[in-house]
Amino acid sequence: MNTDLLSSDGPGRTGRRKRARKERPTPERFSQSPWGQPQYVDAPTEALDAQGVERIHNAAMQILEEIGIDFLHDDAREILKQAGCEVRDDSPTVRMDRGLVMQEVAKAPHRIVMTPRNKERELVFGEAYAAFCQVSSPPNVSDLDRGRRVGNRTDYQNLLKLTQSFNCLHFVGGYPVEPVDLHPSVRHLDCLFDMLTLTDKLVHAYSLGVERVEDAMAMVRIAAGLDEAGFAEAPRMFTNINSSSPLKHDWPMLDGAMRLAKQNQLVIVTPFTLAGAMAPITLAGAIAQQTAECLAAIVLLQL
């Protein structure tokens, strides 16, 4: 029975006053499901049959073996060279044997438990689990009262508070709006501070070079009350990196990703291409290129 429909009003109360009271916002009006991570029940739709998947896979392997991927990072190329990849001193291009690729990719776990500072917000990445986050890094924000405006710290903080409040949002996937009133040189410090003080959910760090990543790891470690060894015992934060298509990984993202991987933190590799601009115009060709770019970075990070 819906108790909102029950009333203890006497006969002198009017229907209008009853409706007015009913429409007044209350905490119960914004009820939500309890915190929890959903799991998919149905198997995902297979876009291709087994033969089609194998053709895409073989095309990606051919790209890695014959064309190669540019790694614009000296340490990354040296690591790959020591692993047996073809690396030339006069070129950033690295070619990989498919045997090495499959060997290293097979080491990546199928299930990762992410542990933020509040262990009750623990998440599973992989298997049939789903995890949702808010949008990341839009330049502008808008609401009904003030309309559209450039991102700023106040709105950034308010959106973080909403992220914390909604149980359907499981982690902080980046800046919910870019606070452009903070200077870029220190923006990551203020933004991470707000993430760690206004939310207790899993946080993300942008993989943009040495200082930002090292600062982010230190702040997450301090917020969780851990020493360096304790921080590295389990994944407690994550980043995602994009390839610089076509067939290239640049220095800032590689450096940040490598630093996080050394501390056993999660790195998600997400190639971003536009078919016909940064990738072949055909869907199959674009997917083969993306697969090659993704696998190349995963091999490096597993090494």
Stretches found by the model and what they are:
Residues 147-303:
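Helix-rich catalytic cores of soluble enzyme domains
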Residues 1-155:
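Acidic/polar, glycine-rich intrinsically disordered N-terminal extensions of enzymes
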